[in-house]
């Protein structure tokens, strides 16, 4: 009789409507929040009277109180005559006394259209696919762009811009859940957005994560930095301003807080040689020596106190994670500088990865597979480059994984039901759709 009563209770539970389902046949999809990579954010700026340009032409907009697009750069701004002006406006200043980063004096910046997918650059193919699934911008589909020049810092160190972004992201995820019947959100991040998302999740209380985040889909999550991060600080490569002189490119790269987050971490890279010169070999274990060698001594303090502590270890985020990344693409692994030292062009030794991120870093999240309570799925995409996630082949696989994550199968409700029955062995007919 006791068994029959339990079966009857299960039948009643399975017949109940979904707790978060909207009336009138509304969508059962969980909301999706997109966190873009470094280059997929828009950045606007305006100049105030406090701006003192290095060259008069750079202050042409000064005092006009008009916003202009700082990033992505347009063709005119990238030309040789204008590139130094753009670099000046995009630079940050690290204040060692305040222990934080800020804009150059007189430059005010903002990230437009927060919460809307209109803010994203290059994500249209994925957005269209998600809309075809039933998502709508501002309804169950949101975006969390950010000022890619900044990052966050460990506890005890201020990070005004990064902390403000995390606060906005918290409110956005809570709002997305509220607008969708209390269903937790699926966070989809790419590249640098994965690093931010990971640190964001680790900074939220576990109860909050379990309540508001159903799943994190991480695309090209290089959670251990990458080799190009060191070369970028040495030469300024990857600044997006090819017409800027190399020394100015390097100064721009070194000014940005996020550049230090790109450096290979000791935990993931260990003693692997990343930069080799005539007299020295630099790995993730002697980054401070590398920073001194390239003349970036002012970067040592923020690296040691604000970056290294955040990446000494990779504790599991304790939310379900799908990690997707490309493999089998030639990826810079070691940069060998010749007689000219850091003034010259390095010879590049290649290894496996996605063309930008090294395989050892892309695989870093896989250590979570042995953590009790951490759900992890890894999807490797042969031949897919770092920026190739929105190509036709990769996009289909990305959408398929997101679709699995957002579908509102009541996993937690069923887990409770079967926990209720865990002392019995019998078969219950399960309706299609489970």
Curated annotation (Swiss-Prot):
InterPro entries for the chain: AB_hydrolase_fold, LACT/PDAT_acylTrfase
Active site: 191, 354, 386
Record-listed E.C. numbers: 2.3.1.-
Gene Ontology terms, MF aspect: O-acyltransferase activity
One Pfam entry name: LCAT
Organism (species): Oryza sativa subsp. japonica (Rice)
Protein family membership: Belongs to the AB hydrolase superfamily. Lipase family.
Name recorded for this polypeptide: Lecithin-cholesterol acyltransferase-like 1
GO biological process, any: lipid metabolic process
PANTHER family attached to this UniProt entry: LECITHIN-CHOLESTEROL ACYLTRANSFERASE-RELATED (PTHR11440)
Keywords from the UniProt entry: Acyltransferase, Transferase
């Amino acid at each position: 009789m006791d068994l029959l009563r339990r079966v009857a209770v299960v039948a009643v539970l399975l017949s109940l409507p979904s707790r978060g389902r909207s009336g009138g046949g509304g969508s059962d999809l969980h909301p999706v929040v997109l966190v873009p990579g470094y280059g997929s954010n828009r950045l606007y700026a305006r100049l105030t009277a406090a701006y003192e340009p290095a060259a008069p032409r750079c202050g042409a907009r000064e005092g006009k109180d008009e916003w202009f697009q700082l990033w992505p750069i347009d063709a005119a701004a990238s030309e040789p005559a204008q590139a130094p002006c753009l670099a000046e406006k995009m630079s940050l200043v690290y204040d060692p006394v305040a222990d934080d980063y800020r804009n150059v004096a007189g430059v005010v910046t903002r990230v437009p259209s927060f919460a809307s997918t209109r803010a994203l650059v290059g994500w249209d193919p994925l957005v269209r696919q998600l809309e075809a699934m039933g998502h709508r911008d501002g309804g169950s589909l949101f975006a969390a762009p950010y000022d890619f020049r900044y990052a966050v810092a460990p506890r005890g160190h201020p990070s005004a811009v990064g902390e403000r972004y995390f606060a906005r992201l918290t409110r956005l995820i809570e709002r997305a859940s509220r607008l969708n019947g209390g269903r937790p959100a699926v966070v989809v991040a790419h590249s640098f957005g994965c690093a931010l998302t990971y640190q964001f999740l680790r900074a939220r209380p576990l109860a909050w994560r379990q309540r508001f985040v159903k799943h994190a889909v991480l695309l090209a999550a290089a959670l251990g930095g990458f080799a190009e991060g060191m070369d970028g600080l040495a030469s300024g490569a990857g600044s997006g301003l090819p017409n800027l002189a190399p020394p100015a490119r390097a100064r721009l790269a070194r000014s940005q807080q996020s550049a230090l987050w790109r450096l290979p971490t000791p935990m993931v890279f260990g003693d692997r040689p990343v930069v080799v010169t005539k007299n020295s070999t630099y790995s993730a274990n002697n980054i401070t020596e590398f920073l001194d060698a390239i003349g970036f001594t002012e970067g040592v303090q923020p690296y040691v106190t604000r970056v290294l502590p955040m990446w000494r270890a990779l504790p599991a985020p304790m939310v379900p994670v799908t990690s997707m990344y490309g493999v089998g693409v030639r990826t810079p692994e070691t940069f060998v500088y010749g007689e000219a030292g850091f003034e010259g062009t390095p010879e590049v030794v290649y290894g496996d990865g996605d063309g930008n991120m090294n395989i050892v870093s892309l695989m870093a999240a896989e250590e979570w597979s042995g953590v009790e309570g951490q759900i992890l799925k890894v999807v490797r995409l042969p031949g897919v480059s770092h920026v190739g996630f929105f190509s036709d082949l990769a996009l289909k696989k990305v959408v398929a994984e997101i679709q699995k994550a957002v579908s509102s199968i009541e996993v937690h409700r069923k887990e409770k039901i079967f926990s209720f029955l865990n002392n019995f062995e019998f078969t219950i007919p399960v309706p299609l759709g489970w």
